[in-house]
UniProtKB/Swiss-Prot annotation:
It is found in: Nucleus. It holds the Pfam family Homeobox_KN. Keywords: DNA-binding, Homeobox, Nucleus. Expressed in a subset of retinal ganglion cells and bipolar cells; including in type 2 and type 3a bipolar cells. GO terms for cellular component: nucleus. This is Iroquois-class homeodomain protein IRX-6. Residues 214-223 have a biased composition (Basic and acidic residues). CDD domains: homeodomain. Belongs to the TALE/IRO homeobox family.
Length: 438
């Protein structure tokens, strides 16, 4: 016989429940069996229930009794075991509760409050009882399974090791593993503790040890005091003082090295900044007056340049008066404009003459570059050096046509230099042919 809606087949005999008496059976007829509820069959079937022993239901397996109490509801009251569903004398009550036409949410309120939460696992067999079927059954949720915090007792071994190795507080991998086993800590906790301890030790040394600017005499005095303390104290105190002195000196050496490195870096930065400033100064353009003075007067640092002075004088009637006598003792520069080809020498005097020609009321002629000849003049005699004129067939220059027989005189530029004595001002004269007509 089987109850298909529950999915648990049960025969006439069970391996868990044994009938107390084979003759005591309870069979009732039902107009509609459970298997034919959906098909609405009219054939009748018989539901037979066998009474079970009370010691098998209540004492041996209470879980099985709670699970199977649904099927033995008519006999649960006799065995002092409550049932989840109360059955009447007629089995159609059970069939009506399982009818698909019946709304299940209304019937759920009758047996849902009586359901209890099952345990983490069900040890159906003693050999399988030690295995945890639930994934949280074997996990210990207490603090014993978590990482242990570092306490004062657990860090005592770490402190002892650090005190023994103060000069080199860096444990190896094997020492870390050994300390982790002793203190029951992880390797990460041990490494973190040693890192924090080294930082605290360095901070304490900076605060309590001698400053890094101490001189040699003060160090000698400190070493003498330390030696006296070692002689007066016991052996343990002497060893501790020697270690402290060694640590202090080693730290002072390290600080001196760091100070030297910092000073070297500062000096390098200052020198780089200085070179950059010099480079910027050298790249700055010179002012216009200083640049002009540097170009025009290379022999002196302080130069004064006067303005040119122009004078137009009429030529005398005599033939020898084509030139104006310059001051005795000074050089004379005579400029002659040829009419043939373009001159090869450019000078400041020609530039001034060209500007004067352009400012004349007549048509401005094309500027021609003069050929300059320096004539030294002595007080007793006057020597003239002239450039021969071109052939007579050539036409006169435009400057000669413009000025005729006149002479254009340009007084020299006064050039005064501080380190040298002042020279006489030279006189620059321009000569134009007198035969040309305007």
């Amino acid at each position: 016989m089987a109850f298909s809606p529950f999915g648990h087949p049960y025969g006439s005999t069970s391996q868990f429940l044994v009938s107390a008496s084979s003759s005591a059976t309870c069979c009732e007829t039902a107009p509609r069996p459970v298997s034919d509820v959906a098909s609405a069959s009219t054939s009748a079937s018989t539901l037979c229930c066998t009474p079970y022993d009370s010691r098998l239901l209540g004492s041996a397996r209470p879980e099985l009794g709670a699970a199977l109490g649904i099927y033995g509801a008519p006999y649960a009251a006799a065995q002092s075991y409550p049932g989840y569903l109360t059955y009447g004398p007629e089995p159609p009550t059970l069939c009506g509760a399982l009818n698909p036409q019946y709304e299940f949410k209304d019937a759920a309120g009758s047996f849902a409050p009586s359901l209890t939460q099952p345990g983490a696992y069900y040890p159906y067999e003693t050999t399988l009882g030690q295995y945890q079927y639930d994934r949280y059954g074997g996990v210990e949720l207490s603090s014993a399974g978590r990482r242990k915090n570092a306490t004062r007792e657990s860090t005592s071994a770490l402190k002892a090791w650090l005190h023994e190795h103060r000069k080199n507080p860096y444990p190896t991998k094997g020492e870390k593993i050994m300390l982790a086993i002793i203190t029951k800590m992880t390797l990460t906790q041990v490494s973190t503790w040693f890192a924090n301890a080294r930082r605290r030790l360095k901070k304490e040394n900076k605060m309590t040890w001698a400053p890094k600017n101490k001189g040699g005499e003060e160090r000698k005095a400190d070493s003498g005091e330390d030696s006296l303390g070692c002689l007066n104290g016991d052996t343990k105190d002497a060893t501790a003082s020697q270690e402290a002195r060694g640590l202090r000196l080693s730290d002072l050496e390290d600080l001196e090295e760091e100070e030297e490195e910092e000073e070297a870096e500062e000096e390098a930065a200052v020198s780089a900044a200085r070179r950059l400033a010099d480079f910027q100064k050298s790249t700055q353009p010179l002012p216009a007056p200083c640049a002009a003075a540097q170009e025009r007067c290379l022999e002196s640092r302080e130069c004064g340049l006067g303005l040119p002075r122009f004078s137009f004088t009429e030529a005398p009637q005599s033939g020898e008066a084509d030139f104006i006598t310059a001051e005795p003792g000074g050089p004379t520069m005579i400029l002659h404009y040829p009419s043939g080809h373009k001159p090869r020498i450019w000078s400041l005097a020609h530039t001034a003459a060209a500007s004067a020609v352009e400012s004349a009321p007549s048509t401005p002629p094309r500027a021609q570059s003069p050929e300059c000849h320096m004539i030294p003049r002595q007080p007793s005699s006057i020597r003239r050096l002239l450039v021969p004129r071109d052939s007579e067939g050539e036409e006169d220059s435009p400057a000669a046509k413009a000025f005729g027989n006149s002479t254009f005189t340009l007084q020299g530029l006064p050039l005064n230099c501080a380190p040298y004595p002042r020279r006489r001002e030279p006189e620059v004269r321009f000569q134009y042919p007198s035969g040309a007509e305007g």
